[in-house]
């Protein structure tokens, strides 16, 4: 057995033809990141730029750096601001500046240690530095663990919309240390639970039922470690299966945008940073659930089950007061628009969805009227 194999970790393959990688859950966690990088084929002696934010770097930065040094890497730590309002080209330029100062080469590595914003910006910086260097994702929020860190989507926001500037850039490794959730603010944990619920709706009715059976969903301290790891594993497996079959969102991967079309409108019109991404997605899922009822795609009972589970997770379910015409205008600028037509992921039952390009503006107006 290889000296770099961690027998206690759960390993989920992301089976891409050109660059397969693993999502590793548990094991030694951040203490074993250096070993896991060696196992993934990264050579000792290479320069590593670890990008993090202050709230994460304080408890975990030194631990990560020590593990990297013990495995023969040469790490440097960069601490950045990581609110959604900081997810801009200017912030990525700061990472580029640090890469220049650290003299990163094409064989060097960037490591994202933090939540989804850190992961998105670091991934995009890696994709664009020297026309692309390797990146590793070390997610420390629930949302990043189950969604943002897996699949290679990177990017930053534009005043006209969320994630309009970006690239697909797959990581060499995703390492999930569930113990980092102990220091995660409860609001952030709840936001991540929105993405977990999403997986239940789009393709895993058993996961949805599992979540329905849990009495307390809104804080990690209420979940037994084994149950938490099961939720992480099922969610990561759901994401990896979709990404493995459709890396660049040519077809099936679009189902991962469930709740995001309306959710991105909420983020854009309410201002980045006023809602956490997962909170906006939760509102978006409730909204598209109502749209599905109006289209008779699924039952009112299914819509109510979804809304109840979202509420139990401590997430918002009320649509904010927004001008319907502004909503329609913002939807038209969404990157998921195809041939000028609005594209939505519509649920047809718990565990099943369809991608629809025929949603009319009048249907959206009626849906917004029902929500308000």
From Swiss-Prot:
Keyword Ribosomal protein among record annotations: no
GO cellular component, one term: cytoplasm
InterPro entries assigned to the protein according to its UniProt record, in alphabetical order: Dehydroquinate_synthase, DHQ_synth_AroB, DHQ_synth_fam, DHQS/DOIS_N, DHQS_C
EC class of the enzyme, as a word: lyase
Binding residues for Zn(2+): 195, 260, 277
Keywords: Amino-acid biosynthesis, Aromatic amino acid biosynthesis, Cobalt, Cytoplasm, Lyase, Metal-binding, NAD, Nucleotide-binding, Zinc
Cofactors demanded by this protein: NAD(+); Co(2+); Zn(2+)
Signal peptide: none
Enzyme Commission code(s) on record: 4.2.3.4
The keyword NAD appears for this protein: yes
Positions of NAD(+) binding: 116-120, 140-141, 153, 162, 180-183
Cellular location(s): Cytoplasm
SUPFAM superfamilies (UniProt xref): Dehydroquinate synthase-like (SSF56796)
Domain of life: Bacteria
GO MF annotations, alphabetized: 3-dehydroquinate synthase activity; metal ion binding; nucleotide binding
Family annotation (Pfam families): DHQ_synthase, DHQS_C
Cofactor: how bound: Binds 1 divalent metal cation per subunit. Can use either Co(2+) or Zn(2+).
UniProt catalytic activity: 7-phospho-2-dehydro-3-deoxy-D-arabino-heptonate = 3-dehydroquinate + phosphate
One GO BP: aromatic amino acid family biosynthetic process
Function: Catalyzes the conversion of 3-deoxy-D-arabino-heptulosonate 7-phosphate (DAHP) to dehydroquinate (DHQ).
Family, per entry: Belongs to the sugar phosphate cyclases superfamily. Dehydroquinate synthase family.
Protein name per Swiss-Prot or TrEMBL: 3-dehydroquinate synthase
Organism: Prochlorococcus marinus (strain MIT 9313)
């Amino acid at each position: 057995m290889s000296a770099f194999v961690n027998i206690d970790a759960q390993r989920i393959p992301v089976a891409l033809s050109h660059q397969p990688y693993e999502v590793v859950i548990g094991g030694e966690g951040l203490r074993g990141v250096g070993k896991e990088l060696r196992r993934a084929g990264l050579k000792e002696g290479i320069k590593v730029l670890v990008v993090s934010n202050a709230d994460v770097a304080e408890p975990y930065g030194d631990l990560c750096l020590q593990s990297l040094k013990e495995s023969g890497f040469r790490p440097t730590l960069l601490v950045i601001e990581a609110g959604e309002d900081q997810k801009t080209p200017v912030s990525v330029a700061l990472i580029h500046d640090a890469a220049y100062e650290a003299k990163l080469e094409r064989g060097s590595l960037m490591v994202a240690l933090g939540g989804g914003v850190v992961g998105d910006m670091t991934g995009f910086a890696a994709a664009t530095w020297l026309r692309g260097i390797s990146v590793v994702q070390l997610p420390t929020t629930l949302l990043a663990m189950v969604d943002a860190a897996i699949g290679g989507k990177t990017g930053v926001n534009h005043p006209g919309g969320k994630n309009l500037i970006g690239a697909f850039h797959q990581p060499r490794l995703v390492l999930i240390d569930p113990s980092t959730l102990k220091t995660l603010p409860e609001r952030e944990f709840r936001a991540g639970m929105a993405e977990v619920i999403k997986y239940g709706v789009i393709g895993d009715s058993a996961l949805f039922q599992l979540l329905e059976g849990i009495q307390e969903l809104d804080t990690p301290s209420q979940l037994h470690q084994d149950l938490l790891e099961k939720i992480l594993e099922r969610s990561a497996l759901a994401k990896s299966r979709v990404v493995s079959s459709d890396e660049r969102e040519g077809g099936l991967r679009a189902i991962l945008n469930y709740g995001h079309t309306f959710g991105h409108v909420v983020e854009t019109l309410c201002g980045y940073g006023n809602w956490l991404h997962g909170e906006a997605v939760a509102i978006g899922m409730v909204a598209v659930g109502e749209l599905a009822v109006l289209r008779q795609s699924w039952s009112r009972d299914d819509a109510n089950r979804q809304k109840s589970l979202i509420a139990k997770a401590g997430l918002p379910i009320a649509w904010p007061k927004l001008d319907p015409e502004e909503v329609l205008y913002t939807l038209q600028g969404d990157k998921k628009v195809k041939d000028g037509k609005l594209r939505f992921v519509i649920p047809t039952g718990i565990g099943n969805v369809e991608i629809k390009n025929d949603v009319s503006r009048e249907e959206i107006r009626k849906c917004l009227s029902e929500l308000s």
